[in-house]
């Protein structure tokens, strides 16, 4: 069953469809903590095993997890990012994709934790400045990004832990900005196109 990863009600509806099929076991790509936990608690009460795919929520205690270690991934991203930014970088941009007041995915959250651990350890004097964009506010992205860059004219290195680095990459293309360096995640089509055009430097 498929669901919209950014909409809790979509996950809940898919979970109900799964429940109606009386499964022997379930493979789950978790959504936010609350809706995932509620579904998994029902599975546990019926002794139905489940595993997590792509994104882990260890406190829910799945039978297994298959996917990337998001904390280590964020730490690794910090290392690669700063190899490019250089030791003299004093301020960098972290773009966050938000949904209903929180980071839109657990992966983003854990990757950021790993990244900040690396930055605190090795580059404590480098300021991480956040640009938070609402998932459902795409019409306002252009003005928000422009205002941010006007306010922080010294920022040239950008990173995001969601799969939508293209939000910045396409902005750079539209506005002919060639002196920015952008790191992101996931080989989605629009990210790949920005990589080819040179407005994304690196994808994990």
Predicted regions and their residues:
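Flexible loop/hinge segments that line or gate small-molecule binding clefts
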Residues: 35-72, 188-197
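Amphipathic helical "hinge" segments at domain boundaries
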Residues: 1-13
């Amino acid at each position: 069953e498929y669901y919209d990863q950014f909409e809790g009600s979509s996950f809940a509806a898919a979970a109900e469809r799964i429940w109606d099929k009386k499964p022997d076991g379930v493979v789950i790509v978790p959504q936010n903590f609350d809706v995932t936990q509620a579904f998994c608690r029902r599975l546990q009460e019926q002794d139905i095993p489940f595993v997590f795919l792509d994104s882990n929520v260890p406190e829910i205690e799945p039978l297994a997890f298959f996917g990337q270690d998001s904390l280590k991934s964020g730490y690794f991203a910090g290392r690669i990012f700063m190899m490019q930014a250089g030791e003299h970088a004093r301020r960098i941009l972290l773009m966050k994709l938000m949904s209903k007041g929180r980071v839109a995915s657990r992966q983003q959250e854990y990757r950021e934790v790993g990244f900040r651990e690396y930055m605190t350890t090795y580059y404590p004097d480098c300021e991480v400045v956040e640009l938070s964009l609402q998932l459902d506010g795409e019409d306002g992205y252009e003005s928000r990004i422009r205002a941010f860059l006007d306010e922080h004219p010294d920022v040239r290195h950008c990173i995001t832990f969601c799969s939508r680095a293209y939000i910045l990459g396409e902005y750079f293309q539209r506005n002919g900005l060639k002196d920015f360096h952008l790191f992101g995640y996931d080989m989605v089509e629009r990210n790949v196109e920005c990589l080819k055009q040179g407005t994304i430097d690196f994808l994990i």
